[in-house]
């Protein structure tokens, strides 16, 4: 890696001069082998494997029985709700887990219903130019799989490179697809689809997170391919093995059986601080893999680095946490690996006291630029109560008898604690909803609060990030929380062997997700108990563990050791806004209830302008009627009537950045994109999504749609 950065435009000119050389070199490429640890150190420009990369496994896929994008399932297989279950559920093979993981993760990110646009506006059968084809979308090619580690075996970040058979050495390209959420390495396969269709390599990483747990009962851990082994047998090959805290794992498990540890929460490494670094490492690994296949061979048989970083168009991409990782990578890219950025709904932790004012219409917004942990612990206190507001009676999951009493009890507790006002649930819930508005949520997010509350999303994220930032051990049970499977008595129970065996494929890395639940270990009536139905010690009421939620919130400003550790950990995750002159497009749904635009993409646009001034090449597109979870559009009644898929606009952002880098086409200016919901009522199927529902970026947005920015303010039209 060079110590100085080559500007993207200079890299583009250099690529044009070297196209003929690259094409000639590709003719000398030798066949690929099934495994590779060769550091290729004997040539004049050897293709040296990065020092952080361990043993590499290479698998080839023929594009018929198996492939890179659909794992042999094809377009219809991905759309099917019937998962490709392993033949032996308690002992799945690596190939079965891969297929299952691709099916699960693709469907977790996009809406796979035909009426929602799958198969017509996006999906494996829609080609790179947007044409609907008769293809099943299978993509032949190879995968390179390895750990990135510091030698300790404690990091073991999964790296995966997909190189399609259509990779064009005359026009080499690559995108990153860092996993969203806390998912495993296939977590952003739906983002990778864009690259595979264009013949680009895709650089994936799980960024130090992952779906499969360390089961403390059996002391078994996941390996890189999702299969499991005992911790002793796995050794340094474990994808994750939980470190002990003040208490040994054996002693902890004897006193607290059936608990599970997850890598993001319990690795004690605060992986988020390194998401940018891991994404850059994925790019470096991908460059090595590309040359391992296509690099020229010297006279002594050494593979050369024919296609280096200056010859490959590299776009950092992904969504949610993966999108935030792409932005972090661009900010940290001192070596000029990345040429452009195209991300959706990114998680962006803003630094404090930037002085940036976010204004919507003629009015500054109530709050902006807070961190994920700040606003999510706020939601974790208020959202369950706000979900009962009578203004939301037509919202998805408003009517949910299983949780209505718990939500009302939370309202009562909040009123007693002075956090909301009102004499009854209706008044208290209206107060809670207003408090969310005051904390920076737009009114467009209102209809999302009931469903997000039912899914306990804010609690899941608050617990996960509290542990991660504080670098807490699973044995610490920070704020009295733990993770375990439960049975009908709602108490911790041994996880079913088949469920555990497939969690690499089925999990998202952030409980609760059945069969793993969030446990309140401090319930005074039941003992350790399902958090959602548990009793708080201070109220002796089933109020969704208010005490736990309040404890998590207090860590943000507290002064004890855990609070100080959390605050220090969070400080390592803040963005700086300097994209180093790279062309970039961020798309974000205005209705996002998980990562609100006022705390993420809107203020980041201002932060970037502070850092880069008028030379900034960042465009921000705010999409009306889009929210965070496209997969819910086809799954949760009421979403399809209200929301359009943001995935359409991520693909268009990638198109725009690619066209800018390769053809000099201007990026779309920052704008509000006015979409049209599909319509219909809560419990009736929405009409099919049409192109007219999701219009393209405007090359010259009307004045009423243009987003403007200077070093001190971001102005977003109503």
UniProtKB/Swiss-Prot annotation:
Membrane spanning residue stretches: none
Source taxon at top rank: Bacteria
Induction behaviour: Induced by PHB accumulation.
Regulation: Inhibited by diisopropylfluorophosphate (DFP).
Gene Ontology MF: a single term: hydroxybutyrate-dimer hydrolase activity
Alphabetical GO biological process terms: butyrate metabolic process
Main location: cytoplasm
Keyword list, A-Z: Cytoplasm, Hydrolase
Reactions catalysed according to its record: (3R)-hydroxybutanoate dimer + H2O = 2 (R)-3-hydroxybutanoate + H(+)
GO cellular component: cytoplasm; extracellular space
Active site: 320 (charge relay system)
Protein name in UniProt: D-(-)-3-hydroxybutyrate oligomer hydrolase
